[in-house]
């Protein structure tokens, strides 16, 4: 299979099921941002961090491919002509969200309680986590916007919301593990 098809040379692309839409369509923005997020998470995984975190991030990347597939499938193409779901055995389930919540809880047990907002930074790896968190929030906003236009799996939105929480806590935990300065934001008076 060739990487290039030339079918997108006029500014359109195909969704799952074959429907062609402009490349600026909210559905493309939505799953394209999830793809961008996945790349940022790969960058975090490539850092010198514990294999425990790397394994969680591999699971997250797998789930993000599923999220992308869901977002790339318009509602009218979710079911094949034979009545079977187009994305059979693919989906986000409550246990995916619970997995993130459990990982958040484990990390938070080892951290001092938050008393202030924290400025992103302190170490390159921590900064990568904050960038991924921001991209995740953008992906979530786009998925919500898409959901306002066409029904979208609500667990996708919930997963992206929880993932941004996970990435924030991971940034704090890595800051702690790396003995990086966690600078509190204290508003000027």
Q: Can you describe what each PLM-predicted range is?
A:
Residues 1-189:
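Phosphate/pyrophosphate-binding loop motifs in nucleotide- or prenyl diphosphate-using proteins
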